[in-house]
Structure formats: C-alpha cells, structure tokens
Amino acid sequence: TRTLEHYFQWLMNAVADAEGGHIQPVLGLGLETALTERISPTLQGFRGMGPVRIGNQAHEHFQHDTYGNIILGAAPAFFDHRLPMNTGRTAFEQLEPLGEQAWELHDEPDAGIWELRSRARIHTSSSLMCWAACDRLGKIARHLKLDDRAALWAERAEVIRDKILDNAWSEDRGAFVESFGGSTLDASVLLMGEVGFLPPKDPRFIATVERLSEVLGRGPFMLRYEEADDFGVPEVGFNVCAFWRIDALARIGREEEARKLFEELLEARNHLGLMSEDTAFATGEGWGNFPQTYSMVGIINGAMRLSRRWEAEL
C-alpha cells in the first residue's frame, strides 16, 4: 500500500502545481515542466537509425486525455480502505478543476494519445478520457454523499458519452474510429471496455474489437493506427496496443483466443522478462524505448485479466 500512497501523493502534487487546472501531458519525476527536446550530435541510434532525442517535445502539447488519466489514477484512493489517506472532500475538490478542464475540452482538437506533432483533431480516445474524468468525479462525489456535485458530474459525463456515440461511430468502417467524423482506425478506442464506457457485450464494442483485430492486427502484435504519422506509415507493432486487444477480447468472451495471443506476445520479451515499446512483426525484434513501462503494465494487466480462478482447477 505504501507504493499506492506515494503514487497518489505524486498525482496530487502534480494537481496542486497546475495552473488553472491545465496539466501538461508529460512531467519529470520531480514534477519538472521544462523537458526541452534536443537531438544528440554524437549518438547514432540503434543500427545508425537516428536521430536520438533527449527530452520530450510532448511537454508543449495539449493532450486532453491527461485529465481523465489522472482522475482514473486517483479515484481508487477514495474507495480502497487499505489506504490510510485523507481522501475526503478536500482531495475531491482538488481534482474538480481537472474535471472542469475535461468538460471544457472534451470536443476540442488536441495532439491525441500518440502525441502527434503535425495535426490536431478531436480524438476519440481524448474525448473518452474526458468522459472518464467526469464519470469518476460523479462516482466519487456520490461516495462522499455530495449529491449536487454527483448529479452535475454525472450529467456532464452523459453529455460527453452521447457526443462520442454520435460522432465517433463509423457505419462505413463498422467500428469506432480515431477521431470525430473520421474514417481511420486507432487501437486506443479499445480502452472503451477498460474504462467502462460501454458494456463488453455492446454490439458496437464487439464490432470494433473485431474490426481493429482484422485491420491492425499482425499475428499477436498490433499497429497503433493505420494512417501515416509524423514519421511515415507504421512498420512495427506497438506492444501496449496488443495488450489492449487481449483485454478487449477477454471482455467480449473470447478468452481462449486472448490467452493464445498473450502467450505468443510474451515471446517478445528478453531473457530478463523485459519488453520494449515496439516489436518488428517479421523478426520479433524489440524496437523503441526499452524497457517500456506501458508494455510491462500490459503484461501485468493481461495476466490478471486472463488468470483462472483457482477453484476452476479443482
């Protein structure tokens, strides 16, 4: 529980430092905000395929999913009685400015979860996380018996939900798509199941899982999206997307298929069990940042999702 306490405190410190509720999408471990990106003049990069970048330009971006991610991370502290923390009304009120930001920005263009540098759209995954911010604030308020606040946040969540359903579903693609009114597919919409936006058996969610698997799946691996980005058409699988797919398949009742993909995906780890950010389809070679937190969290979440209850083995 100590790790959870420290994590919650780090989140709340980030919230306390925010100006007007705005939080940049990436911070240093010590909450540093200036993460100026530069290219190393001496490092050649993996197999000479530079450039090697130091810092992260994303600190300048506007990514509206940030607010939902922080509130999702903080919400369990209000309900988990193992954590001896003061997570009452004061902490809730500290989170509300983030909810206000999510509400104001839920249908505004941003750089999206993938930190795209060259275009801004109303990304479905960003709107989804804005919905999650309002939804969880409503649940926290109800838990704290703050009836007026609970009603307000629940109403806002419902408004955002309706906009996503109206604008992100594509009849032509038979799936939820990357952005409002768009037509391209993006693996991040699979998070709809994980955050509880739609019931797993909703036909639209099932159709989305199947369509994304068909178009973006490459064996056990998965592309982030099908459209060219700042660096061209994606050529390798982004590992956390493959774990999102596994989670979604398990949720819609295809556990054995999910388990098979999970076991195949684990073969991409190194001899220490660590996993990179990306994997080359043909060779299984790790690319990108290493080790990658997203990938390692994907392993943990996937194992928990697919674990059989011990009673089933008796």
Show where each model-derived region lies.
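Extended glycan-interaction surfaces of carbohydrate-active proteins
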Residues: 21-61, 73, 91, 97-109, ...
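Short acidic, glycine/Ser/Thr-rich loop/turn "cap" segments at secondary-structure junctions
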Residues: 50-59, 77-85, 113-118
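Aromatic-lined, polymer-binding surfaces characteristic
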Residues: 88-151, 185-187
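Well-ordered alpha-helical scaffold segments within catalytic/enzyme domains
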Residues: 1-2, 69-85, 129-146, 190-201, ...
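Alpha-helical positions within canonical tetratricopeptide repeat
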Residues: 2-6, 90, 94, 149-152, ...
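Membrane helical hairpin/interfacial module
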Residues: 1-31
